[in-house]
A protein has these predicted regions:
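Extracellular glycan-recognition modules
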Residues: 44-139, 167, 182-191
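Short Gly/Ser/Thr-biased coil->beta-strand turn/linker motifs
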Residues: 23-24, 79-81, 119-121, 157, ...
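Extracellular/periplasmic catalytic domains that process cell-envelope and extracellular macromolecules
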Residues: 15-20, 71-76, 97-100, 151-152, ...
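Carbohydrate-binding surfaces in secreted/extracellular proteins
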Residues: 136-148
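Extracellular glycan-interaction patches encoded by glycine-rich segments
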Residues: 151-175, 183-184
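Extracellular fibronectin type III
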Residues: 1-6
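GGW-centered surface loops in extracellular recognition modules
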Residues: 8-60, 105-107, 176, 184-242
Length: 242
């Protein structure tokens, strides 16, 4: 036997399998979800925003007049999806058909004051919503979050407004949205929030006591060894059984 060495995972970024139960992942730096740089031009309308999670939800807008636009270099060097504050919104297919727990994170900013409605919705669902920063004033990038242990629906998600109301239109830029089908543990929540804050320039909005206020979190994406119960040589992790 040789010297035992520590294994350090090469990939420490958030991925679709990093935190269990990720059911919707929208990223404005990868609108088509293919993992490569987007070829969209500044100001082009966004008819669909591809879900990067394993669930592969459909998030789109079929009506040309209600589509947000793609904006380059609005979160520093990163692109964003801009909603006009009048009637832009996107709709998702049902993430889950039964009630249960959830955890949602949404990154947004408003560069110009007076755009959209006060109390505008970043995300609207029956029974709950995620609201943009209070009022219609400008605000720097920040991570909005919301969660529940149970009783929440994820069947009729709208991004950017509530279509049943004319006073909830969001005017500003969205960078990233993550929805999990359970309430995350505190450590998980802080890691996801820290990742988003550092990625989108929102660390200034984190409280001073946040564990990732100064340094971005590192995720462990290394392969996990799982014994197969009942399989000869594998029900106990041994040298011969691996």
């Amino acid at each position: 036997w040789g010297t035992v060495k520590s294994f350090v995972p090469a990939n420490t970024a958030l991925g679709k399998n990093t935190v269990p139960d990720l059911a919707l992942w929208l990223d404005a730096t990868d609108v088509d979800g293919n993992g490569a740089s987007d070829s969209l031009t500044d100001g082009s309308s966004v008819s669909a925003w591809t879900d990067k999670s394993n669930a592969s939800q459909t998030v789109n807008q079929g009506s040309t007049g209600f589509r947000p636009v793609y904006k380059t270099s609005v979160f520093g060097t990163k692109s964003g999806i801009r909603f006009d504050g009048a009637d832009d919104f996107l709709v998702s297919t049902p993430v889950r058909t039964s009630a249960g727990g959830y955890h949602v994170f949404a990154v947004s900013q408003r560069a110009n004051s007076g755009t959209g409605d006060a109390g505008a919705y970043l995300i609207k669902e029956a029974g709950w919503n995620v609201v943009a920063s209070a009022g219609t004033g400008s605000y720097a990038p920040y991570v909005a979050k919301q969660s529940a242990d149970s009783g929440a629906t994820l069947t009729n998600l709208k991004i950017g407004r509530d279509t049943a109301s004319g006073t909830t239109d969001f005017g500003g830029d969205m960078g990233e949205i993550l929805i999990f089908t359970r309430k995350l543990g505190l450590s998980e929540e802080q890691k996801v929030e820290g990742y988003l804050a550092h990625k989108w320039g929102g660390t200034g909005a984190l409280p001073a006591s946040h564990p990732y206020k100064e340094v971005a979190p590192v995720f462990d994406n290394s392969p996990k060894l799982t014994p197969v119960i009942g399989q000869v040589g594998y029900d106990v992790v041994t040298r011969n059984g691996l």
